[in-house]
């Protein structure tokens, strides 16, 4: 094989390795008031190597996001102090750098999904959901 082809192939291999950046370099903020759901998501995400932070309500979620600069936020829609919609709106309007946001909800109302999409949510997942579905979305957004 000519040297130029070998070099090109090696460069491609390095790029594909870079594309598979270790999950440990990615920070995820979970914002949900349901401790059981938080622990389920945290267990799966930490097992995949992500750094996981937790906030138990919307106000705390905004504060943690501003302080920790996560790469992705997984956000419940219905929480005390501030709804997920208000958190989504504030993060999209005032956050200092691009951030991916996934909303999770037990609500079946389609207008809520439309509102979340209007505010700029990256994915909208209805509860109960398979953790594989969530993980697939996380991996896609953080690729």
Residues covered by each model-derived region:
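The short loop immediately C-terminal to the conserved phospho-acceptor aspartate in CheY-like receiver
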Residues: 34, 77-78
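The feature encodes the CheY-like receiver
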Residues: 38, 80-81, 109
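Charged docking surfaces used in two-component/phosphorelay signaling
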Residues: 39-47
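Acidic catalytic/metal-coordinating carboxylates
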Residues: 57-60, 83-87
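Active-site beta3 strand of CheY-like receiver
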Residues: 68-74
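Alpha4 helix (beta4-alpha4-beta5 surface) of REC/receiver domains from two-component response regulators
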Residues: 86, 108-123, 136
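C-terminal output helix
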Residues: 129-139
């Amino acid at each position: 094989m000519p040297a130029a082809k070998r070099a090109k192939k090696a460069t491609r291999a390095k790029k594909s390795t870079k594309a598979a950046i270790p999950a440990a370099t990615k920070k995820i903020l979970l914002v949900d008031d349901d401790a059981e759901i938080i622990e389920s998501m945290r267990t799966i995400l930490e097992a995949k190597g992500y750094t996981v932070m937790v906030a138990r309500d919307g106000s705390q979620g905004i504060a943690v996001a501003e302080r920790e600069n996560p790469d992705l936020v997984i956000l419940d829609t219905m929480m005390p102090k501030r709804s997920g919609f208000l958190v989504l709106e504030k993060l999209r309007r005032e956050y200092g750098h691009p951030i991916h946001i996934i909303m999770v909800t037990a609500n079946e109302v389609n207008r809520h999904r439309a509102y979340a999409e209007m505010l700029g949510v990256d994915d909208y997942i209805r509860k109960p959901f398979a953790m594989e579905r969530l993980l697939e979305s996380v991996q896609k957004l953080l690729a």
